[in-house]
Amino acid sequence: MNPQEKELNYPLGDRLPLSGERYDLREDVAWLRMPLPFALDHINLWLLRDRCDAREGWTLIDTGASTPATRQSWLKLMEAPEGAGGLDGLPLLRMICTHMHPDHVGLAAMLAERFGCALWMTVGEYALCRILAQPPSAEHQAQLLAHNRSLGLGSPPSQPLGARRDEHAFHHLVPALPRHFRRIRDGEAIRIGDRDWKVITGCGHSPEHASLYSEGSTHASDPILISGDMVLPRISTNTAVWEIEPESNPVRWYLDSIRRLEGCAPLTLVLPSHGKPFVGLHRRIAQLCTHHAQRLDEVRQACATRACSALDLVPILFRRPLDAHQLGFALGEALGHLHALWYDGELARQFDADGVVRFRARTPEAAVAPEAKCAFEATGGSNAPAASKAAGGFEATGGSSARLC
């Protein structure tokens, strides 16, 4: 347990459900734990007792990835006799997916077909999932290569990215998605069993992530937050820039989003997607804000002495060994922190002739937010907007042309 974890309260101690078995937290709330084929080796799913159209059953929060191990765990749950830690013979009445990442939505189509249940999801998550679940095209592969080159990996990349290995590709972990869904929206109240759950959306980790907050049942105050990936007890949520949205500002969006959760009651039981249920939401939010502030300071210091690519920052921000899969996320997160300072006007962005994008500190008098100084980017100085020229325009680096923005 790291020092920050000691500031949180884990009411269940070290108890964990076995894969494919239900662990009851309340009469109406149960915990499932499914395997993942990564260093982060599990995901938590949640079963909520429900009634829909006079039918008794479950509402499922997230599904697990489409892997043989997870499908086997679901088979075990469905076949378990009543009272043996399975579904007790009750159907899934609906699925609510917090967001579109494969470990959260990968088996939605299989479960929808098995139980005839609807998928509930925010429209931003559903739409992006439909795009990413398609087999990659030649155009997308070219886009990905260009993005990897911009990170500093070279073309072809000099280092393998396990996140892009075929067996871990998005469309393999999400082989299908239900053709229709029911949209959920920020602030909406969803009645599940004897509880009302308020939808609280956020971004930075994904486009329109939905957390669910209940103040309690009709019988008692019992605040619970199903936080998804927005607040995790042991690790920080990935806030990465990806090739599909290369101009994003995920770190700032994420920090704004988690502060919205401070309206939850102080003794809220947090049910995260990874790690153990905990109490101490407000303390954990403060820890995460401090963590990102420290990382931004490290980026400032690195860029004060030289122009840095995302790859340059990985050993500075991540001091532990990374496997190939983790490297992909680390690169995206390094770029996310660079973008935060670039959007704040603290860094200048430089496009080098080798395709690598680097960032360096601006002088105080030249610190202009990119929205004001960069209406668009051009490959030649003649098309650069006046604001961009005033802020530095184009520089020569090592004898080669470099664009600044």
Question: Which residues does each predicted region cover?
Answer:
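Short, contiguous alpha-helical
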Residues: 113, 202, 342
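Intrinsically disordered, low-complexity terminal tails and inter-domain linkers enriched
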Residues: 52-54, 153-160, 216-221, 363-403
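A short catalytic or substrate-binding loop motif that flags glycine-/basic-rich loops and adjacent residues
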Residues: 38-40, 182-184, 203-206, 353
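Conserved beta-strand hairpin/beta-sheet module of binuclear metal-dependent hydrolase folds
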Residues: 19-83, 211-230
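Histidine-centered divalent metal-coordination motifs
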Residues: 96-104, 203-205, 209, 274, ...
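Active-site HxH/HxHxD metal-binding segment of metal-dependent hydrolases
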Residues: 69-71, 75, 79-191, 219-223
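C-terminal regulatory/interaction regions
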Residues: 2-11, 16, 297-374, 394-405
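Metallo-beta-lactamase
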Residues: 55-72, 162-182, 189-191, 196-296
